[in-house]
């Protein structure tokens, strides 16, 4: 069966345990790159396009809001691929994050199935050239074709 290129996720979070968990949840469907803080995330965003950006807002400077501001200034369309995954947001912070026209927001601790569904939805709605919907559809079609061939033999 031909290989299907996985969408690439940039995970920007300073918590190593969170990064390990999210990577484990996503590894089957996505390639995950990790940026350990906002500055590292901004540097990666300057040089590469990602299908989905998972962003923690509560990090040492620069925080996640600085990353959102960078995207708003340099390529507003990429905000649609941002899924904020963060803890203990106040109502004003939540409103501020949503004002950036992000794909979604999930609180920590999170349900792993809800996270996976949200990341897939962000990949589809981001509008980039490699939406997960097309990738998964292609993979499903190829798998079905293999199953049909196996039954006919």
Task: Label each residue range with its predicted role.
Residues 110-119:
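C-terminal output helix
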Residues 56, 86:
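Active-site residues of response regulator receiver
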Residues 126-153:
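CheY-like receiver
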Residues 60, 90, 109:
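The feature encodes the CheY-like receiver
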Residues 34-52:
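Acidic, metal-coordinating helix/loop segments flanking the phosphotransfer/catalytic sites
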Residues 3-17, 22-23, 53:
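Conserved acidic segment of CheY-like receiver
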Residues 16-33, 100:
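Two-component/phosphorelay signaling modules centered on CheY-like receiver
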């Amino acid at each position: 069966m031909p290989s299907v290129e996985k969408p690439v996720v940039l995970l920007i979070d300073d918590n190593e345990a969170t990064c390990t968990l999210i990577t484990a949840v996503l590894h089957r469907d996505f390639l995950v790159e990790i940026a350990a803080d906002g500055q590292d995330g901004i540097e990666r965003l300057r040089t590469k396009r990602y299908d989905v950006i998972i962003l923690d807002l509560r990090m040492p400077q620069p925080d996640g809001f600085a990353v959102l501001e960078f995207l708003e200034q340099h390529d507003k369309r990429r905000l649609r691929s941002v899924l904020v995954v963060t803890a203990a947001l106040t109502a004003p912070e939540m409103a501020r994050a949503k004002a950036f026209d992000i794909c979604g927001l999930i609180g920590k601790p999170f349900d792993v199935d809800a996270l996976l569904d949200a990341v897939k939805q962000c990949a589809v709605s981001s509008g980039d050239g490699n939406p997960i919907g097309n990738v998964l559809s292609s993979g499903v079609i190829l798998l079905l074709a293999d199953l049909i061939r196996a039954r006919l033999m």
